[in-house]
């Protein structure tokens, strides 16, 4: 499984190479932060791969062909929002898989914290924060803010 994590990091680094994320940081930093919140190598592998399929540069089939565990591929597939898919239908699909849910919760937490740290929140930031909170509550039944405030 450790070898899979190494492969996943290499793939994610190649796909995110040269791209910038929020606050103009290298895009790879987000999946690395999400990965760092995971407790085992399977969930770390999913975390580092969670955005790669949406990039359009690799498919679930290619991840399977590389030899990633079917459970990893299933979770990554659920975490890859399909074109035209409504956001909360996407969240409902994630709920069907514990591994995908675990990674999505870490993803939402990281996204929430990055947007909250902006000194001047834009209207878009506020809308995204509201969406993250609603998705988190949908997945857990708990408030994202109250959960983070206790960490």
Could you say what each language-model-derived stretch is?
Residues 1-151:
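Active-site helical microenvironments for divalent-metal-assisted chemistry
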């Amino acid at each position: 499984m450790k070898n899979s994590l190494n492969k996943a990091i290499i793939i994610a680094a190649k796909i995110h190479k040269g791209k910038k994320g929020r606050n103009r940081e290298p895009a790879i930093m987000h999946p690395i932060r999400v990965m760092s919140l995971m407790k085992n190598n399977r969930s770390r592998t999913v975390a580092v791969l969670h955005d790669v399929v949406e990039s359009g540069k690799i498919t679930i089939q290619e991840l399977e062909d590389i030899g990633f565990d079917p459970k990893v591929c299933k979770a990554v597939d659920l975490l890859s929002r399909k074109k035209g898919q409504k956001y909360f239908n996407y969240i409902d699909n994630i709920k069907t898989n514990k591994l995908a849910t675990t990674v999505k919760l870490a993803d939402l937490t990281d996204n929430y914290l990055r947007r909250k740290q902006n000194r001047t929140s834009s209207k878009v930031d506020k809308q995204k924060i509201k969406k993250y909170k609603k998705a988190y509550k949908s997945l857990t039944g708990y408030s994202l803010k109250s959960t983070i405030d206790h960490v």
